[in-house]
Amino acid sequence: MASELCKTISVARLEKHKNLFLNYRNLQHFPLELLKDEGLQYLERLYMKRNSLTTLPENLAQKLPNLVELYLHSNNIVVVPEAIGSLVKLQCLDLSDNALEIVCPEIGRLRALRHLRLANNQLQFLPPEVGDLKELQTLDISTNRLLTLPERLHLCLSLQYLTVDRNRLWCVPRHLCQLPSLNELSMAGNRLAFLPLDLGRSRELQYVYVDNNIHLKGLPSFLYNKVIGCSGCGAPIQVSEVKLLSFSSGQLTVFLPAEVKAIGTEKDHILPLQELAMRTLHHNYHASLKDLDFLSPVSLPRSLLELLHCPLGHCHRCSEPMFTIVYPKLFPLRETPMAGLHQGRTTVSFVAYCCSTQCLQTFDLLS
């Protein structure tokens, strides 16, 4: 086996192969023959599926500087090492079905990366530096142990497909609603009890799958007329079991995002002072060409300054930004034309989040 491996690599070196297939070789270590002398300078794609690798060499980028695809599916790699950040031409990295516990921050240096697949590992978090991957189009981190996603993920301006199925997510950063290119979002099999208010506001986002999030009872009305999957959602549960603000209408109850501080009703004609102040500051912020210098560094807490950049959501009726209070209105899915797709048995509702009593009274999902 060793001699056959050496021969394969030697031929690739002599003939300046661009693709090298070392799948199913029972390799426990990265082949030294790949790293000898100047390495394989012409190699662009390396496939090493179903081996027993536990780590990657520190000089990988030095010996294989032109790699655009590295396929390491089904190995035993525990850590994505710092050296990975030096593969500046890498476009596709597949580390699915390994034993990954840590992804190093240096992964953010892979500025050419377009496809990152980390499914079926042991990851509990992603480094914020993932947000530096401006060319990233596909991110698959399904079947891990993630509790949340980094807020900076919304800086992945080219991201089109995000898959985080079968993790332990209990919330999704509202910042992800700002992803300008996101077309498909799949979060099935998590622990979500609510979704960001603005999810679905982007016209680019067309497919959202949240199946089997049993505590999830409300879908933002922006998702109406999108392709959605919500089977297994809205299971009966005592509201006291979930420590979140909830809103009820008739026999229906939905949980609201943790950032929501108050719920308005048709009787609340006057907005809270903090909400009025935040809306005024937000308008001034945009009127001053997004220059917050008119605010002194100590005039607002950091959390409120951050809210100015990324509001809680936008009114589903008039697009007015909202910061602390929302006026919700429920539309049971079973009473919409979409009921047939779910055999009319779902207890999930569409939720319109409005900014005032006027918008609350005039919003109509079906009009």
UniProtKB/Swiss-Prot annotation:
<feature type="repeat" description="LRR 8">
    <location>
        <begin position="181"/>
        <end position="202"/>
    </location>
</feature>
<feature type="repeat" description="LRR 4">
    <location>
        <begin position="89"/>
        <end position="110"/>
    </location>
</feature>
<dbReference type="Pfam" id="PF23598">
    <property type="entry name" value="LRR_14"/>
</dbReference>
<feature type="repeat" description="LRR 1">
    <location>
        <begin position="16"/>
        <end position="36"/>
    </location>
</feature>
<feature type="repeat" description="LRR 3">
    <location>
        <begin position="66"/>
        <end position="87"/>
    </location>
</feature>
<keyword id="KW-0433">Leucine-rich repeat</keyword>
<keyword id="KW-0677">Repeat</keyword>
<dbReference type="InterPro" id="IPR032675">
    <property type="entry name" value="LRR_dom_sf"/>
</dbReference>
<dbReference type="GO" id="GO:0005737">
    <property type="term" value="C:cytoplasm"/>
</dbReference>
<dbReference type="InterPro" id="IPR001611">
    <property type="entry name" value="Leu-rich_rpt"/>
</dbReference>
<protein>
    <recommendedName>
        <fullName>Leucine-rich repeat-containing protein 28</fullName>
    </recommendedName>
</protein>
<dbReference type="InterPro" id="IPR003591">
    <property type="entry name" value="Leu-rich_rpt_typical-subtyp"/>
</dbReference>
<feature type="repeat" description="LRR 9">
    <location>
        <begin position="204"/>
        <end position="226"/>
    </location>
</feature>
<feature type="repeat" description="LRR 5">
    <location>
        <begin position="112"/>
        <end position="133"/>
    </location>
</feature>
<dbReference type="Pfam" id="PF13855">
    <property type="entry name" value="LRR_8"/>
</dbReference>
<feature type="repeat" description="LRR 6">
    <location>
        <begin position="135"/>
        <end position="156"/>
    </location>
</feature>
<feature type="repeat" description="LRR 2">
    <location>
        <begin position="42"/>
        <end position="63"/>
    </location>
</feature>
<dbReference type="InterPro" id="IPR055414">
    <property type="entry name" value="LRR_R13L4/SHOC2-like"/>
</dbReference>
<feature type="repeat" description="LRR 7">
    <location>
        <begin position="158"/>
        <end position="180"/>
    </location>
</feature>
<dbReference type="InterPro" id="IPR050216">
    <property type="entry name" value="LRR_domain-containing"/>
</dbReference>
